[in-house]
Amino acid sequence: MKTLTITRPDDWHIHLRDGAQLTDTVRDISRYMGRAIVMPNLVPPAIDTETALAYYDRIKARVPAGSQFEPLMVLYLTDKTSPDEIRKAKASGKVFAAKLYPAGATTNSDSGVTDLKNIYPALEAMQEVGMLFLVHGEVTDSSIDIFDRERVFIENILSKIVTDFPNLKIVLEHITTKDAVDFVTQASDNVAATITAHHLLYNRNHMLAGGIRPHFYCLPILKRNTHQQALLAAAASGNKKFFLGTDSAPHAKDRKEAACGCAGSYTAHAAIELYAEAFESVNALDKLEAFASFNGPDFYNLPRNSDTITLVKKAWDIPASYPLGDTNVVPIRAGEQIDWQVE
């Protein structure tokens, strides 16, 4: 039987939600991930250090016994985020980054940034203290086609930020296009990107051809096959700028299977297994460990995990749904099989 032992991986982009749902999301992600960068787009969002630390405590209270899982917290940037708040967050030792959500770009982003110039003082402070800048890279102009919003963001906004803040460490989150791959590859060593398992495994045909499959609907939206292939090539290249970020984002079944369904795909139930499938599809299993376990902590200047997990090439059945607080979430690959499992 084929096996693969790798250093324990981390997830550098996940949504754990809050309240009753936390028990289920934390259980899933802590099975084999050592750490996770936890997104702050709650209701209300984690816009200050105090709120982020309270959220940290709620997550830690739900980590199963025996697990060493550690959440890494993120500030939600607003037009009013101050340099002092950035310094306070950095000094806490628990907040590792601040996140740009262009107002209206994705789930719970209404409190986000309306004009980039409003956060320039905060970005100056982040550059000064060494706090990472995480970016949801899509424009929100309704006149821009949804499939072009990442490319336009890179051309019109991100390129300027990189120029204006050359010493700021930036992660372009959940990239979906060849444009993003090329930009990150050519940028300085201070620019990196996360890639999701679902963007490696699927493209827009999977979501739209032969019927609409709402559980593939996420933001940034799945793109055409040529972009999917560029993402696979980047992930499997060994380039240290690309690393694992699931963007696992649970929504209740009835919020997805609706006339106006929510954006987000749930993959925390089988994240590393899905990545193993993706890497195997391009004969690059030997590159999985660096992508999943080395590149992220190296970019964040954190130690790599010291223990290991073992993946086994053995198919298993994915349930039709998983519990999510007082409701249920339909995961990616629901009712189907995944080729790999953690031993």
From Swiss-Prot:
Gene3D superfamilies, alphabetized: Metal-dependent hydrolases
Active site: 247
GO biological process, alphabetically ordered: 'de novo' pyrimidine nucleobase biosynthetic process; 'de novo' UMP biosynthetic process; pyrimidine nucleotide biosynthetic process
Binding residue positions for Zn(2+) 2: 99, 136, 174
Any one of the GO CC terms: cytoplasm
UniProt cofactor(s): Zn(2+)
Alphabetical list of InterPro entries matching this protein: Amidohydro-rel, DHOdimr, Dihydroorotase_CS, Metal_Hydrolase
Pathway assignment: Pyrimidine metabolism; UMP biosynthesis via de novo pathway; (S)-dihydroorotate from bicarbonate: step 3/3
Alphabetically ordered keywords of this record: Hydrolase, Metal-binding, Pyrimidine biosynthesis, Zinc
Enzyme class, UniProt record, top EC level: hydrolase
Keyword NAD: no
Tagged with keyword Metal-binding: yes
Any single Pfam family the record assigns to this protein: Amidohydro_1
Cofactor note: Binds 2 Zn(2+) ions per subunit.
Catalyzed reactions: (S)-dihydroorotate + H2O = N-carbamoyl-L-aspartate + H(+)
Modified residues (N6-carboxylysine): 99
Binding of Zn(2+) 1, residues: 13, 15, 99, 247
One Gene Ontology term of the molecular function aspect: zinc ion binding
Binding site for substrate: 15-17, 41, 136, 219, 251, 263
PROSITE patterns in alphabetical order: DIHYDROOROTASE_1, DIHYDROOROTASE_2
Listed EC numbers: 3.5.2.3
Subunit structure: Homodimer.
Protein's job: Catalyzes the reversible cyclization of carbamoyl aspartate to dihydroorotate.
Similarity-based family: Belongs to the metallo-dependent hydrolases superfamily. DHOase family. Class II DHOase subfamily.
Name the record gives this protein: Dihydroorotase
Organism name: Shewanella oneidensis (strain ATCC 700550 / JCM 31522 / CIP 106686 / LMG 19005 / NCIMB 14063 / MR-1)
